[in-house]
Amino acid sequence: MSSSKPLIIVLLGPTASGKTALGIEIAEHLGLEIHNVDSRQVYMDMDIGTAKPSQEQQKRIRHFLIDLKPPNEKMTMHDFHKTARVSLDNALNKTNVGLLVGGSGLYLKALTSGLCPPSIPPESSFRKQLHDIGQEQCYQLLQSCDPLSAKTIAPSDSVRTTRALEVFYATGQSKTSLQSSKPPPWRLLELGLNPSNLNDRIAQRTENIFQNGLIEETEHLIGKFGKELPLLNTIGYAEASQMIDGKLPLNDAIFQTNKRTKQFAKRQKTWFRGQHNPKWLNEKNPLSEALSLIHNVIR
């Protein structure tokens, strides 16, 4: 493969694995900027609960693809893909090397494979109807009207089932067939972090976000956007919201957030094993190994 092709370095791993810190070190050594791939960090006003790179970290290295929209405006995969490609192309024009850092597997896969999702906006009333029907019947419906997409979706995956049905009823076509796929013109080096003490790191991260102002951040979001904001149902914010309502004491909120985060990390690792093929870095000295692998590819 021609070394003149641009190189995209992907640093992936489950939540709390240390991607942000290592990504910054790699960027500093190579003179790069970071393109964040996190489905919640694209939203403004959501810093603590999403473990967004701090202001100090952003001063050290410029980060792109964060704070793109207010949390009451949906960032679709199509929107993200389009914005990310422009951002990456700008970086590649300057250095011929781009650095992606994140744990949102579906976003990473779409971006690195060149798969562009259809630009069909979500339709709340239709989604409510599907929710009322229930996932089992929704999946059977999908198998009937769009068997091609159904084969790629787990029967329990209500989010992707709903989206596939939404696209089909809006266009009359399969979501799978509507997705345009054009392999991007770059080389790809995927590096992975999966520390053996991940559960301890998650527990510490959970303690930190509550101590550092998650409750206050959640109160701000409720005051600005209302209790019905969908993102308030995500990990951490949901527990903080229940605590604010007096439905959950602090210790239970921390416990539930920790539990849900570990479950999420497990799903992330399953995705990375099935959809990506990263070189898993030695946890004792990941920076040294990462730089060695990168220099071998660049040469």
Swiss-Prot record:
InterPro entries: Dimethylallyltransferase (IPR039657), IPT (IPR018022), P-loop_NTPase (IPR027417)
Residue positions binding substrate: 15-20
Single Gene Ontology BP annotation: tRNA modification
Enzyme class: transferase
Cofactors demanded by this protein: Mg(2+)
Catalytic activity: adenosine(37) in tRNA + dimethylallyl diphosphate = N(6)-dimethylallyladenosine(37) in tRNA + diphosphate
Region (Interaction with substrate tRNA): 38-41
GO molecular function: ATP binding; tRNA dimethylallyltransferase activity
EC number: 2.5.1.75
The UniProt record lists the keyword DNA damage: no
Keyword Transmembrane appears in the UniProt entry: no
Record keywords: ATP-binding, Magnesium, Nucleotide-binding, Transferase, tRNA processing
Coiled coil spans: none
Positions bound to ATP: 13-20
Gene3D superfamilies: 1.10.20.140, P-loop containing nucleotide triphosphate hydrolases
Swiss-Prot/TrEMBL site (Interaction with substrate tRNA) positions: 104
Function: Catalyzes the transfer of a dimethylallyl group onto the adenine at position 37 in tRNAs that read codons beginning with uridine, leading to the formation of N6-(dimethylallyl)adenosine (i(6)A).
Complexes and interactors: Monomer.
Alphabetized NCBIfam families for the sequence: miaA (TIGR00174)
Protein family per UniProt: Belongs to the IPP transferase family.
PANTHER family in alphabetical order: TRNA DIMETHYLALLYLTRANSFERASE (PTHR11088:SF60)
Protein name: tRNA dimethylallyltransferase
